[in-house]
């Protein structure tokens, strides 16, 4: 953040905007509803606490929010793991249709508009497919394409430890 506003409150190593907001609030006055919103923001921005941006402070704040009555398991399940039957079908199609290349270090999959129509899903239902591809054992780089319009594709790139996909995406 370049500090472009008149007033700036920047915590460079904060995991999320929600973590920054928490530090600005009077902890005693945070309601359960507000705590749920802050917790949801932290969970999303940290990838359920697995991204490098997650710190001890992040975990302490999450714990304090849980003490306000946040149902952490429900928020995480509803946000990341609960899928409709159609979402599971398109995920299965994407995984079954995936191809490993470069001695198995890279995996890619493509979902067409025709397949999306067949399963009755839209682009929001494709969330999580790239992450499932990425966590395949032996894979360093995952690529997921889905067709937005005839011959127009959205491409998602994810990597694990050794490949900087931001250099390709830039």
Feature locations, PLM:
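Acidic-glycine-rich active-site phosphate/pyrophosphate-binding loop
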Residues: 1-2, 169
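Short alpha-helices
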Residues: 2-61
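Hydrophobic helix-and-loop "lid/oligomerization" segment in the mid-to-C-terminal part
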Residues: 47-170
